[in-house]
Amino acid sequence: MQIYDKAKKDRRNKDLLNIMKKHKVKLNFQKSQDETWGVVLDSNNKNATILFQKCDNPAASLAHELLHIITQLNGYKKIELWTSPKLDTEDFNILMAALDNELQHHKFYNQFISYGYKDKEFYVDSDKYTEIILRPKINSYIKSNNISLIKIIPDFLTTIGKGGHISEESKKEIIELFYSINNNQYETQLKNIGLIKKNGV
């Protein structure tokens, strides 16, 4: 039995899977190349490929991806990635992908919890190390004195995201560190990003 078969049998996912049937969405499963789970929904909203990997909470991981699908079925339009000769498109597209992902998370986090899952099950297993990884990165941003806003926003979004292993107390402390980058040059922009995300735009 594949790990996703076990996840599909979890009673907490029954309603989510029924929604897939209602919308006639065919679920295909493909092993991920890394530790993460993910999903790609085709333009017709009829075929979804769920990337899976062995993890501690496969049922929660499946629920997470099904909620991504449902969010899009309910009208959410994914942010399109693009290229431009005037921008560092790699950094820009990393930013857009992170923003798109976090906006969807904001929309369905409460649903995830309502199905009986815990906030610490919202992300991949390695999320438990996110704070350990984040702090040295932020310190390097602070020391650089010339880091661009576009490079720090993905990590900022990770910090202010709902759920996960970072405590609220630590989040507040880390957010203040972000504000201090480049002598508080980006504080206003980062606060505005936080407000947009809080209000669910």
PLM region descriptions:
Residues 1-17, 58, 87-93, 115, ...:
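Short, structured coil/loop segments at alpha-helix boundaries
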Residues 1-45, 55, 94-102, 106-121:
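Auxiliary, metal-adjacent structural segments of Zn-dependent hydrolase domains
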Residues 46-62:
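Short pre-active-site segment immediately N-terminal to the catalytic Zn-binding motif
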Residues 60, 71-106, 194-201:
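Post-HEXXH active-site segment of zinc metalloproteases
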Residues 64, 68:
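Histidine-centered divalent metal-coordination motifs
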Residues 71-75, 112-117, 161-162:
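Hydrophobic/aromatic-lined pockets within catalytic cores
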Residues 79-82, 90, 97-98, 102-144:
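Active-site-proximal or metal-binding-adjacent scaffold patches in catalytic folds
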Residues 126-201:
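Pan-zinc metallopeptidase signature
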